[in-house]
Amino acid sequence: MKKVAIIGGGISGLYMASLLRLNSNYEVSIYEKNNSINLEKGYGIQLSVNSVKLLNKIGFQNINFEEKFFPNKVNFYSLKNKSKICDLDISAFNSHEDRYTTLQRFTLIDFLRNKIPSNLINFNKKVIEVQSESEITKVIFEDKSSIECDYLIISDGAFSKTRSLIANKEIKPSYFNSIAVRGNIDQNDLWNIDHNNISLFLGSNLHSVVYPVNQNGQFNFIAILRKKLNSNELANYSLFNNDEFVSSTLFEISKQVDRNIVENLRDIKCFPVFVSTEIFQPKNKNIYIIGDAFFTFPPTFAQGASQSIEVAHELYKNFENGNDHFNKERIKRTKMIDRKSKFNYFVFHFSNPLMIFIRNLLMRYLVKNNRFINSYVGKIYKN
């Protein structure tokens, strides 16, 4: 039996552990630096069909219907003209059970956590050293404890310390010249939008998204605002909890986004957006990286959670097939999604009136062009 150690108890780490527990050839444990799994309620995530199909293999379809929502389309709105541009039918990629799903992040994390016996999740385990010169990898933690494993899977987020340790250099994501504002809002406080689907609002150097996260009228709101920050501001993470900074950011957003939405947001959080600039692959064939530690995407194709699940599943299949590392197709696919996400960001944030007019005109045509949709969206949703 091979021992597998997973560093990080987020979506990718928990899902990977759930898969490995299906195979009696592996003994798996999770090591989380925090004192608990983050089960904070409220904030939403989107899961496209490519990840829902994989989650359903471990029983995701059995989650209480009330805790999920199944939007059929994305409605695009112009913040400048306060009008609808067009809509994209995302249900075209659905099957009977594999449907585009929105839900609270808590719901997914709780589902995955309950797949893992509590004694297999170890908390307060901050990695300070990785020794991997031999077939057996040794991991040393800050509390002076250590473990040995046959396979080490790193899934401790975009700012993965473990990834930097095995690379013998600091690997950090780059600031995307944007900040995000996230919050919750009730259906009763959302006027003049389709409550049964995803609403995407395009503005000047700004876009925002509103979508239901369950069947009970709760919605997730997120806005991405272009904003340059200097190195001192980025180093001072308390800045994003500063009431004055958050208020000024909300004021900036309210210049374009419906003030009624901004004024009725709850549980507001503000944070900088970071993205990956490279894909780092360990030289040691027994060490793997998944989730945001593998690659962090811009938040403009709603693929963060879906790709974490997809990459973990591919690694599991590689384990079963005896492959050492992700193949070239995975690298190619990651770069393709990254390019499209960056292109979306560029197009969503147009300021020039002529460019906005041309964009809106093209969008109305392209969302009805099946060949384009199958190429641009289908290549991601239909893995």
Label for each model-derived stretch:
Residues 2-4, 21, 48-186, 228-233, ...:
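Conserved N-terminal helical subregion
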Residues 3, 26-27, 218-221:
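Residues at the starts of beta-strands that form the adenosine-phosphate
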Residues 5-23, 153, 181, 245, ...:
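Conserved mid-domain beta->alpha element of the FAD-binding
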Residues 12, 36, 159:
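Conserved Rossmann-like nucleotide-cofactor binding loop
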Residues 21-41:
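Glycine-rich FAD pyrophosphate-binding loop
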Residues 36-54:
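Conserved N-terminal glycine-rich FAD pyrophosphate-binding loop of Rossmann-like flavoproteins
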Residues 86-100, 104-109, 189-267:
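Conserved FAD/dinucleotide-binding core of flavoprotein oxidoreductases
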Residues 363-383:
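C-terminal auxiliary extensions adjacent to catalytic cores
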